A protein has these predicted regions:
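Aromatic-rich peripheral "rim/lid" segments of glycoside hydrolase catalytic domains that contact
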Residues: 1, 5-8, 12-21, 206-212, ...
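Hydrophobic faces of well-ordered beta-strands that scaffold small-molecule active sites
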Residues: 5-9, 41-45, 66-70, 95-99, ...
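Substrate-binding cleft of extracellular glycoside hydrolase catalytic domains
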Residues: 54-137
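Aromatic-lined carbohydrate-recognition surfaces of secreted/lumenal glycan-active proteins
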Residues: 71, 122-141, 190-199, 203, ...
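Active-site clefts of carbohydrate-active enzymes
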Residues: 158-166, 187-218, 237-250
């Protein structure tokens, strides 16, 4: 974490249409990663199927240093097996596996469930670091201890934009919030901490979200939170995903309770056509990276 730089990545060609995933094709994944490589050498993914299982091998061919494979539903044997297969096939680049994203927060599983799963996965992948991801506040309580004891490193989501003061606060305060959260997490966890999700959407402007705000926030965060051996952050996210504003509404199973969130479409440092936003110019180029 000290010398590299991670970005949270979902393939631009992997989308949800009427509640069903499309398939990410290798050529599109390669095009995505070629755009990212000058600024990033680490990837954190969210899924292990529908074409995403090809990400580690393509990343390795482009000189990426590390991939943390995400498993969207680690209780689906096909998804977990695909992730484990990709990790075994690419041992030089796959450094970690993330078992789900906010599963406890969404009340789909418990800390105890995930702790047992981590033990099981570690038996199958003894050389790979095992983690899961929750919003930061979920790890503060004593009930999280059973899971924390089984995590080789912590992945955590820290979003200042969800705080009621964010829209009126300067970037200094938003970045300081992230630093303070990570410092508090060290009271409950002694291992490496990687903030998986932290960022600012670039629209809609009426919500206080603009490309300029995204750029200035990341610049301030990098100043206050420089990478260290035991603590760092990943840029969230690589690319815009316009479908994310509508995917719950498009899924009949969730249509009755879904709420539109237009900002969810605009987290990317690049738009859905891989065009850079202003924030990219303020992310330093990596030494030795292709240009």
């Amino acid at each position: 974490m000290l010398h590299g730089r991670f970005v949270a990545y979902s393939p631009t060609s992997l989308q949800m249409v009427d509640g069903q995933p499309t398939r990410a094709d290798p050529a599109s994944i390669r095009a995505d990663l070629q755009v990212l490589r000058p600024h990033f050498d680490g990837l954190i993914t969210y899924g292990s199927v529908n074409g995403a299982q090809a990400i580690p091998a393509i990343a390795a061919s482009l000189g990426f240093r590390a991939v943390i494979i995400g498993v969207w539903d680690p209780y689906d044997p096909s998804q977990l097996d695909a992730a484990i297969g990709a990790a075994r096939a690419n041992p030089d680049i796959v450094t970690g596996i993330s078992l789900g994203n906010e599963l406890v927060f969404s009340k789909r599983h418990s800390f105890t469930d995930l702790a047992a799963l981590a033990v099981s996965v570690r038996r199958r992948l003894p050389a790979i670091a095992v983690s899961t991801t929750e919003p930061f506040h979920m790890f503060y309580g004593s009930e999280a201890a059973v899971l924390l004891h089984q995590m080789d490193f912590m992945l955590v989501n820290v979003h200042p934009v969800f705080q009621p003061w964010f829209r009126r606060a300067p970037d200094h305060n938003a970045a300081e919030f992230v630093v303070n959260v990570v410092t508090k997490l060290t009271d409950v966890y002694c291992g490496p901490i990687l903030v998986k999700e932290v960022g600012v959407p670039t629209a809609p402007p009426e919500g206080g979200f603009t490309p300029e705000r995204q750029a200035s926030f990341f610049a301030e965060l990098l100043t206050q939170f420089p990478p260290a051996r035991e603590r760092s952050f990943a840029y969230f996210a690589a690319f815009d995903a316009p479908w994310r504003a509508f995917d719950e509404i498009a899924d009949p199973a969730h249509a009755s309770s879904a709420v539109m969130h237009p900002e969810e479409a605009h987290w990317g440092l690049f738009d859905e056509r891989r065009r850079p936003k202003p924030a990219v110019a303020r992310v330093p180029m990596l030494e030795g990276a292709p240009r």
